[in-house]
Amino acid sequence: MARTRFLQGLDDLRARLLRMGGLAEQAVDRACQAYIDRDLTRCRMVLEGETQINITEREIDELAFDLLAMQQPMAVDLRFILAVTKINADLERVGDQAVNIAERVMDMVDLPKADLPVDIPRMAAAVSAMVRRALESFIEGKAELAQAVLEMDNVVDRMKDEAFIVLVKSMNEHPETTRQALDALLVARNLERVADHATNIAEDVIFWVRGADVRHNVAPEPPVQHEVTESH
């Protein structure tokens, strides 16, 4: 009976994290579109959604701690619970970055538009794809999907570095659009941080599935078990 309740708790934990992931992904998408369209309605939706993200984060942590206290989990279950708590924290921070972008848009909405030499929508699309792929790797329990996210992070890092170079140059050559260029640079930095959190999520999925710590560029160990295909 205790094992059955524990397994039900794992299912509930997984479902709650998927909901959290959906909220965070939605927040990023709305914030990015708000920046592209200067859409205050979407900005407000991001800010209002932060409360639910924070509530869900606390609920997940409480459930995870309850499950750890319920019984001594088997290795794969313990890794799952630990991964969920870490992914949960990263998703909350993804939501924070979405709020930062939304607040930036609200500050800049009255400024005249400037033709800046940077493709923020392209970077936003790449970052959104990273978040989506990281969540898919968790849903499917596939370490190879998570590994693809780690590779995508290099692309986003290059985009951010390129944005910094061209925007600083733009500020020097066109001081009248310095404020707009600075806003774009800050948004690019927010997007890079979202990508970093997506990378963390992918690393946690690899830890759960393979029992391998791939943080800090440590080469992954050979899988210690088959890819996880069950719900936990």
Regions found by a protein language model. Give the residues of each.
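Cytosolic, long alpha-helical scaffolding segments
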Residues: 1-232
